[in-house]
Amino acid sequence: MASITFKGNPMTLLGNEVKVGDKAPNFTVLANDLSPVTLDDSKGKVRLISVVPSIDTGVCDAQTRKFNEEAANLDGVEVLTVSVDLPFAQKRWCATAGLEQAKTLSDHRDLSFGKAYGVAIEELRLLARAVFVINANDEVTYVEYVSEATNHPDYEKAIEAAKAAL
């Protein structure tokens, strides 16, 4: 099981840790229009899933912008940003950030994604910062559980993993 801290305090993660080589677990989250979205909806594509505690914080904002900017240069890679923010807040953030094309997904309803990927923080009911790359065959090819939730992920390694999965 991955272990993380939030501002130096140890946190409990719910669900199972996902590892490279695993079949990617399915999940159901909500799009900004409240429609359900599952992993199967992007079947056959390479997915870079960027997980953030809240889109309205500085590191989460930077992470979402960075991965969406990088993905613009990667044909065949779909970037999905998952948080427990309400879909309305995610939609507002996308409009304010000028990233209307960004795919932000909300796990607020039942933590389906958080539990399936082992990133649901029990004490805070937030998601731990993490990055997953899933290839077109639904195999997990890259995993990073960021050990301190307020730190940035390794952007370069994640982008390289997404390129390698094409």
From Swiss-Prot:
Catalysed reactions, as listed in the record: a hydroperoxide + [thioredoxin]-dithiol = an alcohol + [thioredoxin]-disulfide + H2O
Alphabetical list of CDD domains matching this protein: PRX_Atyp2cys (cd03014)
Residues at the catalytic site: 60 (cysteine sulfenic acid (-soh) intermediate)
EC assignment: 1.11.1.24
Residue ranges occupied by any Thioredoxin domain in the UniProt entry: 18-164
Cystine pairs: 60-94
Pfam family, one: Redoxin
Domain of life: Bacteria
Signal sequence annotation: none
Keyword terms of this UniProt record: Antioxidant, Disulfide bond, Oxidoreductase, Peroxidase, Redox-active center
One example GO MF annotation: thioredoxin peroxidase activity
Functional description taken from the UniProt entry: Thiol-specific peroxidase that catalyzes the reduction of hydrogen peroxide and organic hydroperoxides to water and alcohols, respectively. Plays a role in cell protection against oxidative stress by detoxifying peroxides.
UniProt subunit comment: Homodimer.
HAMAP family in the cross-refs: Tpx
Note: The active site is a conserved redox-active cysteine residue, the peroxidatic cysteine (C(P)), which makes the nucleophilic attack on the peroxide substrate. The peroxide oxidizes the C(P)-SH to cysteine sulfenic acid (C(P)-SOH), which then reacts with another cysteine residue, the resolving cysteine (C(R)), to form a disulfide bridge. The disulfide is subsequently reduced by an appropriate electron donor to complete the catalytic cycle. In this atypical 2-Cys peroxiredoxin, C(R) is present in the same subunit to form an intramolecular disulfide.
The family this protein is said to belong to: Belongs to the peroxiredoxin family. Tpx subfamily.
Protein name: Thiol peroxidase
Organism from which the protein derives: Halalkalibacterium halodurans (strain ATCC BAA-125 / DSM 18197 / FERM 7344 / JCM 9153 / C-125) (Bacillus halodurans)
Gene: tpx
